[in-house]
């Protein structure tokens, strides 16, 4: 397994995801989205596995003005706006090769090889 966890250090679900893999002695790479966001390729891969860009955005987030701006941005510009503002992406994003999840999903992770 090649696990990557994209999240923030303050996010409780990200901390729970890290704990899940540590308890099972599964090595993972943590990527702090405040320091280094996702590349366009990484984002597209995760979005494709999770039902598209709309599902990647945490519409319940704190920055309502930014979320409203993204919501009404033209579809062709939406991806760039989300990549410029990684704080709107649901976390943690956990990747294992082509497989990925959004949020804390231990039942799915247990099935990964």
Q: Which residues are covered by each model-predicted region?
A:
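Thiol/selenol-based redox catalytic cores and closely related redox-interacting motifs
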Residues: 33-113
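Local sequence-structure signature of Cys/Sec-based thiol-disulfide redox active-site neighborhoods
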Residues: 1-24, 28-33
């Amino acid at each position: 397994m090649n696990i990557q966890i994209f999240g923030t250090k303050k996010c409780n679900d990200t901390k729970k995801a890290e704990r899940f893999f540590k308890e099972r002695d599964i090595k993972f790479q943590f990527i702090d989205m405040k320091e280094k966001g996702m590349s366009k390729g990484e984002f597209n891969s995760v979005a494709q596995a999770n039902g598209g860009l709309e599902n990647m955005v945490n519409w319940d987030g704190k920055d309502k003005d930014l979320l409203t701006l993204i919501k009404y941005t033209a579809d062709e510009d939406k991806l760039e706006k989300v990549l410029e503002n990684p704080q709107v992406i649901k976390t943690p994003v956990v990747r294992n090769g082509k497989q990925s999840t959004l949020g804390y999903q231990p039942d799915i992770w247990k099935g990964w090889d």
